[in-house]
Amino acid sequence: MNETNNNNQSQAGDSPQKAVIKLFVIAMLTLFPLFLCVTFSGSFPFLSLSDGFFSIRHDKYTLFLALTGIAVIAEILLFVTQNPQDRQNSRINLRELLRLSITDMAVFAFWLVCAVSTLLSHYTETAFFGEPNGRNNGLLLMTFYLLAYLLVTRFFEESKLIPRVFAGASAIIYLLAVLNGFHIDPLQTFVYLRDHFVETFTSTIGNIDMMSSFISVSLPVFVVMSCAAGKKPERALYISASSLGFMALLCSGSDSGILGLAVFLLIYFIAYSQNLMKLRRLMLTLTIMLASSRLLLLLSAATGDYHKELSVIQTALIYSNFIYIPIVICAALTAALYLITVKKCRRALSPASPNSSDNNNLVHKKPNLKLPKAATIALGCLALAVIAAVLGAFVYFSAIDTKTDLGSLEKLLRFNERWGTHRGFFWIKSFEIFKSSDFIHKLFGMGPDTFYYAFSPYFDELTKYGDSSTTAAHNEYINYLITIGAAGLAAYLCAISGAAVRAFKYARESMFAQACIAAVICYAVQAFVNIAQPITTPIFIILASICEAMARSCEPRLITTTKYCGK
């Protein structure tokens, strides 16, 4: 009896800590991306969002620090104010809290490299606080990333509420992005912006590249959850959010999210080929997502084709009739999979004897809704062949045939200094910087968020592309290579891959774990052509931390204590 009471007290003592982290995660997935600075005006309704974009990066940076700081202080206060009995019970789990996984060690190594890089930097203040006109990615922000990671990985517990509210908040952000894409400004955030910024800012996220990054880290969550939702209203929520997210991606003016989404869908299509029910739901969601692009045609017609600048891919997906081909294919696959799964389920419910019509004699068998492994292997080989063909074409037209006119595809298939809105220039010069660095700087970099100083010798050359300076390489991995060196980049790659791999290994039966893994994959892919910043990267850190949290809870040694593994 006493043992039972102790266990109940222990669980009660843990519940406030988990409740704090639940609120923290919800705030980071709803309040944080929705937040825009509000100013007071002299006329009704006395509140204005017109200045929201002028300091959006600093505002969200400050909000993240504040939310994380409040969560840390709350956890400390909960521990300090525990009564002696609860504190004694909580010590039982102290060893588990202090246990380090391979992901934990990589995260600590990443922070340690950032600290060493800051100490060795010639620009210590910038390395610590971050470049004010850059991305605020200094040691201070990295420290708060570490704190957020530790909070989530130690105290997070899965809740169905979290992906639901995330979907609701993201749907609002997506809808605003779609409206802003056609110069419809319901929040009046573009009133005081110059034309250039009106074209490149959107929704409550800011720059279109940041919007693409946000879609990359959120949309995969809803696509995966739409395959898991048991109730129709919940599934409708995730499918609606997915469709709005796809439309927002087409209106964002940036291709990085399309790249990440394509890789994610390819991987999960192959993975779900082993489960016909999941594959059917995935194809249904994909069909509706693709069909939703037709709504943009109606919006375009209603606004007289008055929209922001679109990329070649986005223009084709919205205005070209070829989009009907994948829509029809996905719809046909959905219908075929529906018929197959229904037929298999009916076969599983068969009479005990051929001559019996009594329902009481029905034998309930688990329907076989899996394809042979050979089918999955064949799909994987086909995907690899497609990827190899694309990469082969990229290498061929970049290194061998550099003269053939590729038209609009040249921006995609021919790498040179002009490639990817002159990202090629940033990358080529960045590798020259790394090559010419001494051993210490190769290992630890120039200091966090000091890319501006490292790249300054090339500013004169950069003017031919219309820029006078830059604070980022427009490739997260190259950026880390220059700022925190090879050691920092290696630690970062180990951390994000470790979180995803461990979640897949130990918690893959949980659909929310699968959703967070999808977010990590999609973000990691789009990061090849995008940048880390305090607007969307904190959300990625939270979702990657959830991967590790669920892996910790579902490891074999803890399988008797978890309540949600495999659900």
Label each region the model flagged:
Residues N2-V38, L63-L78, V107-L119, L139-F155, ...:
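Alpha-helical transmembrane segments of multi-pass inner-membrane proteins
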Residues T39-N83:
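Hydrophobic alpha-helical membrane-insertion signals
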Residues G42-F46, Y123-E125, L179-T189, A302-G304, ...:
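Helix-to-loop transition at the C-terminal end of transmembrane segments
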Residues S43-H58, T126-F128, V191-T204, G304-L317, ...:
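Juxtamembrane membrane-water interface segments that cap and precede transmembrane helices
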Residues D51-L63, L97-L100, N133-G134, T315-I323:
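Interfacial loop-to-helix junctions that mark the boundaries of transmembrane helices
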Residues E75-L97, S117-F128:
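Transmembrane alpha-helix boundary signature
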Residues F129-N137:
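Non-cytosolic membrane-interface motifs at loop->transmembrane helix junctions
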Residues N207, E417, T421-S469, I484-G488:
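TM-adjacent membrane-interface loops and short helices in multi-pass inner/ER membrane proteins
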